[in-house]
From Swiss-Prot:
InterPro entries: AAA+_ATPase, ATPase_AAA_core, DNA_pol3_clamp-load_cplx_C, DNA_Rep/Repair_Clamp_Loader, P-loop_NTPase, Rep_factor-C_ssu_arc, Rep_factorC_C, RFC_lid. ATP binds at residues 48-55. GO terms for biological process: DNA repair; DNA-templated DNA replication. Keywords: ATP-binding, DNA replication, Nucleotide-binding. It comes from Saccharolobus solfataricus (strain ATCC 35092 / DSM 1617 / JCM 11322 / P2). This is Replication factor C small subunit. The keyword Glycoprotein does not apply.
Amino acid sequence: MSTKVEEILWAEKYRPKTLDDIVNQREIIDRLKKFVKEKNMPHLLFAGPPGTGKTTAALALVHDLYGDNYTEYFLELNASDERGIDVIRNKVKEFARTVIPGDIPFKVVLLDEADNMTADAQQALRRTMELYTENTRFILACNYLSKIIEPIQSRTALFRFYPLKKEDVVNRLIYIAKNEKAEYDQKALETIYDITMGDMRKSINILQAASAYGKISVEAVFKVLGLAQPKEVREMINLALQGKFTQARDKLRTLLITYGLSGEDIVKQIHREITSSEIQISEELRVLLLDYIGETEFRIIEGADDEIQLSALLAKMAIYGNKYIGSENR
């Protein structure tokens, strides 16, 4: 990526450059620092959700190993972008054949999204790893460890990356916003975390996009994401719980048509509101509704009609709202 683009993208501009710069995943960072100290390492397997620091940790590791000229010793490949295992194998062969003098007798290949490779491609990758193990170390990054074949897992040191804590993500967003002199609401930053579920890269991208509205507010965040405002989703839910099914369904159609939202988007927002403190209902009712929300999301993902499934969910809310809340509270 060019310097000009890096200056534009906050996610790259504020990416930690060294292991000491990384403030989370402390246990992993401490283990990686030992490799730097020993100037040796095995093949590594980084597993965890998107945006938890897998690529950042790999880049910081090779930077600390080789210094500012680490790019001469480092090859980054993406399993999704490459045209097949033959392309990857040829690139690795070309990369590994040249020897650069120095204290460290090996180069490093980072293969991102390795879990997108077929089992056959992974078997071929395993053979490639064995062929060049004398002067090349592989770092494989994946979102789903279960999709990596056992022969590769057994030949690598596993590092599990866990979702980042809310405090860590929000504090990082505050630091970036202040550094960029961007005005922000604390609630907006917390909302970004809730939406991204701790994906730091996605959180920073949303922060930057929302800053274009002048002030980083909750409204700006939802505009950037193309989602309905939370108050509109809450209004729909409350109408249903009050037994006003027709009005709730009309609100649903507005969200689907006017905002152009997908059923999956809406059901996720409903889930977010039901689990928040904004919707005042009993825990028993909350548990029941969450069960139906899960069923609705599953059916939508499986291909069922968005409006029919969401209308059925609103009908369930109306039925159980009447049962658990009662007409005296309306």
